[in-house]
UniProtKB/Swiss-Prot annotation:
This is Urease subunit beta. GO terms for biological process: urea catabolic process. The gene is ureB. Its EC number is 3.5.1.5. Pathway: Nitrogen metabolism; urea degradation; CO(2) and NH(3) from urea (urease route): step 1/1. Heterotrimer of UreA (gamma), UreB (beta) and UreC (alpha) subunits. Three heterotrimers associate to form the active enzyme.
Length: 102
């Protein structure tokens, strides 16, 4: 093995394979780009993003950890969201939850 080398198993790595995803349409109504990271509580994203926020309660983007989705002004995109798991406690972001989701 070479120092720093990674050896991966065979086949594809599936993210969130065991989680049910929903698809929503999101429009950036603002005049600036908005970037949303993989672990951000989607319900609390920038208010310039227009979508049915009730559907996003307790959910995050269905993308690999550390990735993000960028919405340019006027962009309309469909994104997949999955539930937060574990204790389902959310703190920070825009301070709209600060506790248990359920």
């Amino acid at each position: 093995m070479i120092p720093g080398e990674f050896k991966f198993g065979q086949g594809k790595i599936l993210c969130n394979a065991d989680k049910k995803a929903i698809t929503i349409e999101v429009k950036n109504t603002g005049d600036r780009a908005v970037q949303v990271g993989s672990h951000y509580h989607f319900y609390e994203v920038n208010s310039a993003l227009d979508f049915d926020r009730k559907l996003a309660w307790g959910k995050k983007l269905d993308i690999p950890s550390g990735a993000g989705v960028r919405f340019e002004p006027g962009d309309v995109k469909k994104v997949n969201l999955v539930d937060f798991t574990g204790e389902r406690r959310i703190f920070g972001f825009h301070d709209e939850v600060n506790g248990y989701l359920d």
